[in-house]
UniProtKB/Swiss-Prot annotation:
Chief localisation class: secreted
GO MF annotation terms: toxin activity
Listed name of the protein: Ornithorhynchus venom defensin-like peptide A
Species of provenance: Ornithorhynchus anatinus (Duckbill platypus)
Signal peptide: 1-22
Organism domain of life: Eukaryota
The organism's taxonomic lineage, starting at the top: Eukaryota, Metazoa, Chordata, Craniata, Vertebrata
Length: 66
């Protein structure tokens, strides 16, 4: 009984039960840096506070906030 409940809970979380979407949360992918008001900076910048799950157009840069 507990295993069934845990499996149903997992399915509800991964597939956002009730939202009408069958797309799992982890398939949404990364957002552009500007979506989070971040700034694309060189990867060697030591003052960069990296924003996870974002991307920059230039692969030599990463999304930062200051």
């Amino acid at each position: 009984m507990r295993l069934t409940y845990l499996l149903l809970l997992l399915v509800a979380v991964l597939f956002q039960a009730g939202s009408g979407s069958a797309e799992p949360i982890f398939f949404y992918g990364r957002q552009p840096c500007s979506y989070y008001d971040g700034v694309c900076r060189d990867k060697s910048d030591v003052n960069c506070k990296y924003i996870a799950f974002t991307y920059c157009e230039n692969p030599n840069q990463r999304c930062c906030y200051y």
